[in-house]
Every structure is written in C-alpha cells, then in structure tokens.
Amino acid sequence: YGCGGVQAAVENPELGLINNWLLHIRDIWFKHSSLLGEMPQERRLDTLCELNVMEQVYNLGHSTITQSAWKRGQKVTIHGWAYGIHDGLLRDLDVTATNRETLEQRYRHGISNLKLKHANHK
C-alpha cells in the first residue's frame, strides 16, 4: 500500500511526537507477530496495513458512541478499506460491520482470511 506510517512504526526511527501516533501500529505488529514473522519482508508492510484497518474497525465498533447508536437501532455501518498509494486503488477488506455481532464475525473472518492468504503464498 505504500504507507509511510506503517513503515515508520516497524522501523521505529526517532520522529518525536509522531512516534506516539505510531504506537498503536507497533502494538498490532506485536499482537500479530507470529503471522507477520512468517512472511517475506515485501508482504509484511501491506499485511500490517490491512491488520491496522481491521483493528481500527474493531476499535471503532467497540467505542461507546458506536455501541450506543447500535443499541438505539441507528443504522451505522463501519467499513474497512485500504488505499494503495502506489496504485490509487481502494480495497475493501471485507470487515464491514453493521452491529456488534457482525463486528465480531467480520473481524475474525478478516484475520482468518489474512492467514489463509499467507498460507496460499508460501
């Protein structure tokens, strides 16, 4: 995807206050290190971008604002898309959530798809 933020989170250079913004991506790196560690370097950053999107969909879906809206029956939909800087394409990562149940299902499905995608590229 060509995301400089994800690359900086992995390389961890001294960037001052920007490093605080990148901590969450580093947490995702460590959380999914077994999957990412098995991958060739050229696929790691793109996969970390996708994991970051999935984690952010999950976090947003668990926010009190979103949870309250869903409890009230409001039609709130969270989409997980990744934009490729290198090709200008927007990719749907298939983690769209419309309620708490679909949030959990789509998150697990998205992670499983990434593992399967990696297994098929070995």
Question: Model segments located where?
Answer:
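Divalent-metal-activated hydrolytic enzyme cores
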Residues: 2-122
